[in-house]
Amino acid sequence: MSKPVNLVLLYGGKSGEHEVSLVSAASVLKHLDSEKYHIIPIAMDKSGRFHRHDYNDLLACSDKLPVVTEKSTPLEGLLINGRLAVDAEIVFPVVHGPLYEDGCLQGLLELAGVAYVGCDVLSSAIGMDKDMARRLACINGLKSARYKLLSWHANASERQQFCHEVASEFGWPLFVKPCSLGSSVGIHKANNMDELNAAVADALRYDEEILVEEFIVGREIELAVLENSIPCGKPRVSMVGEIKVNHPDGYYSYTAKYLESSQTDLIIPAQLNNSLEEQLKQAAANIFSYLKCKGMARVDFFVNDKTEEIYFNEINTLPGFTSISMYPKLWQATGIAYPDLLDELINLAMIHHNCRQHLVTNYL
């Protein structure tokens, strides 16, 4: 039997999605094969400090993993002298939000010369920015909701003018979103000017730039994409899933997603005609390729039921892995069990790392 691969499970972090990460990490820990991997859990607290745990100490944590315990060991940093602080061949990041999902962490791991699961620096950075992702995703005629951007540099007068302009152009309701955040953190539905002003102020607490977009009447559709391990092979796309929100918020808010998820239905497979389903799968594969994604991504759309028009919403290059997360659920329904999915992602990460190791970096 081959020696287990030393794998760092990295979770937590100082972002608005810290709590989501703890839940995702517990689910990943549960499904990783301990005979294949020597698992080294490393948590990041909300101040950015690192804490190493023993795998066996966390096995009883079924709902979410702890950040600090009596048995955890503080680390000086994730890297020491430019290399990973622990002996590991690969890092599995189960972290979300700025610094971790936007290419920063990926760049750090590149500098450390260690393999890591998921997209690289470029695709992570593009995917995290809703504006940039839409610009690339919609280059061949695919639509997205109309939107306008607002920077935190705008003064009170400029913010007020902006709010009146978007309301006049797009009508009500409007959606306000931080440009580079996920898990519905900082997202609001605004039905009038007072709500819009409050939503803009709150969203700017989480990001330097926000977008305000028109409301699209339609169904919320999600697809999971997995890179093909065959060189030059087309991305693999799961069956189509749908999110039906019965929550009073009226949309897939943070509360509806994580705190009161019983009021949200995840429908797999979504009931769509064959033609529309194929269009969605092709669009998801195209977007994955346009953004040069590696490993995995979840691609989200809105579909107008009457016209069957497809609107790209966003791409998530480090999707959630909680028990209710669409990414693993879609692959389970498509025929790839959760542990096999993790194995596949780790294998893809090792392939990319080995390729990078063979690149020429000395030109003399």
From Swiss-Prot:
UniProt keyword list: ATP-binding, Cell shape, Cell wall biogenesis/degradation, Cytoplasm, Ligase, Magnesium, Manganese, Metal-binding, Nucleotide-binding, Peptidoglycan synthesis
Pathway(s) served: Cell wall biogenesis; peptidoglycan biosynthesis
UniProt superkingdom: Bacteria
Gene Ontology molecular function terms on file: ATP binding; D-alanine-D-alanine ligase activity; metal ion binding
Catalytic activity, EC: 6.3.2.4
EC class (word): ligase
Cofactor stoichiometry and binding remark: Binds 2 magnesium or manganese ions per subunit.
PROSITE patterns cross-referenced by the UniProt entry: ATP_GRASP (PS50975), DALA_DALA_LIGASE_2 (PS00844)
Family recorded in the similarity comment: Belongs to the D-alanine--D-alanine ligase family.
NCBIfam families documented for this protein: D_ala_D_alaTIGR, PRK01966.1-4
Protein known as: D-alanine--D-alanine ligase
Species of provenance: Legionella pneumophila (strain Lens)
